[in-house]
């Protein structure tokens, strides 16, 4: 099975502090520690899973690489020498597992273990316009591929892997646990059943090398922030003939200077002049598909919201367009000329003489103040 998200394992968000991550790990470690659950294989697996997640997220450099690229951003424990098991360690056990190595699947009875490749994650930042209209792009994803020098065998050219002398090529060894006989992943070949007496110099016997893979990604119109696009088979390669993992492209939408998105709806603030608010009239507003206009009535107050139907974003699932909500902001004039100030004073005097009919909210507020002090 594919590796789970490290943040999900610990039950914390991606913005969690170091202390929160440490606290979450301690809680899980206490709950699932093998000494407290001697007969629970599930608890033991969860304990190892939590430990691996903590080891990655507690290291600032590893956490940064994981946040950017997912599991592919964290280097496997690549080792050289005769074992050729460095790459296998990336899928393997933290402490050693007498019940069989965690994180993979078992092949034929007594044969080498087969592992599905790890899933990869790639964060892709796009604009709101690209999200609304769809977008085709290419991305470069760091991934592990078969070493071309040794064709993935891990052996030096001209040589071949040989059966592991510890497990006889089976990838597993049998251990006696009291009255029970159980299979354990071979500690020498790490489940592959093979060792390389002469490891490949390019990949140090791992059979894998890290490189950037260029992929085309089609972003559907209407996609929202946080949605993921799955690219099957473009994750890390499997082990011992296992299938490759998948690539998940997680969408991040840049903040727009004018619009705020709420699902398929859009919101924007529209500044209008004092005169336009008082007299009413037609105003022109931008949308993601061009310009639109609507009429505001006389006496429009600041904060009034106008709804333009179907001027939002067409939903990626619903197929229907959301609405555009225009929030009117009446702008108070500044840097007035003397003539403008004179006219404003005259206007203010006329408003006072006209009584509450010109400023009903002001009249209501004054009445409330008067009642408050009486």
UniProtKB/Swiss-Prot annotation:
Zn(2+) 2 binds at residues 164, 167, 186, 189. Its main location: cytoplasm. Binds 2 Zn(2+) ions per monomer. PROSITE patterns: DNAJ_1, DNAJ_2, ZF_CR. Zn(2+) 1 binds at residues 147, 150, 200, 203. HAMAP family: DnaJ (MF_01152). It holds the Pfam family DnaJ_CXXCXGXG. Keywords: Chaperone, Cytoplasm, DNA replication, Metal-binding, Repeat, Stress response, Zinc, Zinc-finger. It is found in: Cytoplasm. The J domain is necessary and sufficient to stimulate DnaK ATPase activity. Zinc center 1 plays an important role in the autonomous, DnaK-independent chaperone activity of DnaJ. Zinc center 2 is essential for interaction with DnaK and for DnaJ activity. GO terms for biological process: chaperone cofactor-dependent protein refolding; DNA replication; protein refolding; response to heat. Residues 35-50 have a biased composition (Basic and acidic residues). Belongs to the DnaJ family. Participates actively in the response to hyperosmotic and heat shock by preventing the aggregation of stress-denatured proteins and by disaggregating proteins, also in an autonomous, DnaK-independent fashion. Unfolded proteins bind initially to DnaJ; upon interaction with the DnaJ-bound protein, DnaK hydrolyzes its bound ATP, resulting in the formation of a stable complex. GrpE releases ADP from DnaK; ATP binding to DnaK triggers the release of the substrate protein, thus completing the reaction cycle. CXXCXGXG motif repeats lie at residues 147-154, 164-171, 186-193, 200-207. PANTHER family: CHAPERONE PROTEIN DNAJ, DNAJ HOMOLOG 1, MITOCHONDRIAL-RELATED. This is Chaperone protein DnaJ. The keyword Cytoplasm applies. Homodimer. InterPro entries: DnaJ (IPR012724), DnaJ_C (IPR002939), DnaJ_domain (IPR001623), DnaJ_domain_CS (IPR018253), HSP40/DnaJ_pept-bd (IPR008971), HSP_DnaJ_Cys-rich_dom (IPR001305), HSP_DnaJ_Cys-rich_dom_sf (IPR036410), J_dom_sf (IPR036869). The lineage of its organism: Bacteria, Pseudomonadati, Pseudomonadota, Betaproteobacteria, Burkholderiales. It comes from Janthinobacterium sp. (strain Marseille) (Minibacterium massiliensis). GO terms for molecular function: ATP binding; heat shock protein binding; unfolded protein binding; zinc ion binding. NCBIfam families: DnaJ_bact, PRK10767.1. Residues 5-70 form the J domain.
């Amino acid at each position: 099975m594919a590796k789970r998200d490290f943040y999900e394992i610990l039950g914390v968000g991606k913005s969690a502090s170091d202390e929160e991550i440490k606290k979450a790990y301690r809680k899980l470690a206490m709950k699932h520690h093998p000494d407290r659950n001697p007969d629970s294989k599930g608890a033991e697996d969860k304990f190892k899973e939590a430990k691996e997640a903590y080891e990655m997220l507690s290291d600032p450099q590893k956490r940064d690489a994981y946040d950017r690229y997912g599991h592919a951003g964290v280097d496997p424990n690549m080792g050289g020498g005769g074992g050729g098991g460095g790459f296998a360690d990336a899928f393997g056990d933290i402490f050693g597992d007498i019940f069989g190595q965690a994180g993979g699947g078992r092949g034929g009875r007594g044969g080498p273990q087969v592992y599905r490749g790890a899933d990869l994650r790639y964060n892709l930042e796009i604009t709101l316009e690209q999200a609304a209209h769809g977008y085709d792009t290419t991305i470069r994803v760091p991934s592990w591929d078969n070493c071309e020098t040794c064709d993935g065998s891990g052996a030096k050219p001209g040589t071949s892997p040989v059966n592991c002398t510890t497990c006889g090529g089976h990838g597993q060894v049998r251990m006696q646990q009291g009255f029970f006989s159980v299979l354990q992943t071979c500690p020498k070949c790490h489940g592959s059943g093979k060792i390389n007496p002469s490891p490949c110099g390019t990949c140090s016997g791992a059979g894998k090398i890290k490189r950037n893979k260029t992929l085309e990604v089609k972003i559907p119109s209407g996609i929202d922030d946080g949605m993921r696009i799955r690219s099957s088979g473009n994750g890390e390669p499997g082990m011992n003939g296992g299938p490759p993992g998948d690539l998940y492209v997680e969408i991040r939408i840049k903040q727009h200077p004018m619009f705020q998105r709420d699902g398929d709806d859009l919101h924007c603030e529209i500044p209008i002049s004092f005169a336009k608010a008082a007299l009413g009239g037609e105003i022109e507003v931008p949308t993601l598909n061009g310009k639109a206009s609507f009429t505001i009535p006389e006496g429009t107050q600041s904060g009034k919201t106008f709804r333009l139907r179907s001027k939002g974003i067409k939903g990626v699932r619903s197929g229907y367009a959301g609405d555009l909500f225009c929030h009117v902001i009446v702008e108070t004039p500044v840097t007035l000329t003397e003539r403008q100030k004179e006219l404003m004073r005259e206007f203010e005097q006329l408003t006072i003489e006209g009584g509450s009919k010109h400023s009903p909210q002001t009249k209501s507020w004054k009445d409330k103040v008067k009642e408050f002090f009486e």
